[in-house]
Amino acid sequence: MEEFQRYIELDRSWQHNFFYPLIFQEYIYGFAYDHGLNKSILLENAGDKKYSLLIVKRLITRMYQQNHLILSANHSNQNDFFGHKHKKNLYYQIISEGFAVIVEIPFSLLLISSLGAKEKKIVKSHNLRSIHSIFPFFEDKFLHLNYVLEILIPYPIHLEILVQTLRYWVKDASSLHLLRFFLYEYRNWNSLITTQKSISIFSKRNQRLFLFLYNFHVCEYESIFVFLCNQSSHLRSTSFGALLERIYFYGKLEYLVKVFTFTKDFRVILWLFKDPFLHYVRYRGKSILASKGTSLLMHKWKYYLINFWQCHFSLWSQPRRIYINRLSKHSLDFMDFFSSVRLNSSVVRSQMVENSFLIDNPIKKFDTIVRIIPLVGSLAKAKFCNVLGHPISKSVWTDLLDSDIIDRFGRICRNLSHYYSGSSRKKSLYRIKYILRLSCARTLARKHKSTVRAFLKRLGSEFLEEFFTEEEKVLSLILPRDSSISRGLYRGPFWYLDIFCIHDLANDE
């Protein structure tokens, strides 16, 4: 961010939200290059190692030349890798990456200034960004709540909705026109936002721009939920992967009433936001609204949310995208955990003179359980086991060194143990570790044309140590494994505040 402030003179451009001139600045594409663009894309001459402003200008000019972008029947061959279709996608990739960097610059600086002004209030902002900070909040608050709304956030069907949302913040008509033109011409967008996994998984190409636009859309939607204020302020930063999620949240806390002045119909629900037992959290495209209120109150919330999406965002949300459940009878499927509130009976024997009696005290406990079946499915998809969970060898890794193979398997095992460390029942994780250990052994045995038993006998205990987490190694040195204290530490849930995303097995290679 210091590089942005060093290179960009914002007093003339971004203070009036004029982004279009920045598109023609060469260093912008240098920043975009650092975020994953192909090195050869923006080079005028591969030997010069300089980004060419001429190429950027040519690309924008070609985008506005309709005849150049329309594919004719003569160029419809799918095997023509260097044909017009490849060039068209290449142009869009370059412009989208550059545009995404540009629109993020002013929002990034606003966030920095906001954090600097309120540094004393949010000292632990780095830790609070962790997605694991949601679960301590659940443990603290959900024990006293009754009902929960599980909400699947609708996505905009029409591209113009995204442009109109951004229009309130970006006053530069040229930039908006370029964005609109780009979205309408990029044919893969429709398939991107209509697939089942569109909320959580974005296309590898042009990911930055689409993630920015979706986050901006969600940011506007979540402006009505800033009633969280101080009681759940540590959840401000539990977002799913982009800068924009946290930008305006801090400022909006001080302007609660202004959020609801856009229509008279929503002023009547202000009293709902003042409810101290109403809490909202979100990860990716799923959000949860929990309350201590009655079922009637939650049905009102469902009605208000559907009407809000329709009136303010022109989004049609089907009622089945919002589920009302009672916490005591239903488990939340959230962030790869099954979370529930269950009652534990604590029997106390009381003796008074000659009479004795038993007192049964029900105690509420928040449980988090690993979703073992989807996790095994992920391992099967990554070719560590079959669909039944039986370990198999990772054939694509047999060309690696033995140390690299063991390190890769051990890293995946430690990452999964790290993420699911908060589970109340860790027995299911032992099955995952078993699959990875045996898959690693099968891979090494296949490489050396040996048997698994012979290979494990040769490696011994050193092989298993690669699959231990750092916490397990430390505890094994301090406490004996069979002691009651050690068993409690091994089995007890604990959460980390350095986890910012769910581990993806498919991308670990």
Curated annotation (Swiss-Prot):
Q: Which GO terms describe its molecular function?
A: RNA binding
What's one GO BP annotation on this UniProt entry?
tRNA processing
Q: Which UniProt keywords apply?
A: Chloroplast, mRNA processing, Plastid, RNA-binding, tRNA processing
UniProt subcellular location: Plastid, Chloroplast
GO annotation, cellular component aspect: chloroplast
Q: What does this protein do?
A: Usually encoded in the trnK tRNA gene intron. Probably assists in splicing its own and other chloroplast group II introns.
UniProt record similarity statement: Belongs to the intron maturase 2 family. MatK subfamily.
Q: What is this protein called?
A: Maturase K
Q: Name the source organism.
A: Pereskia aculeata (Barbados gooseberry)
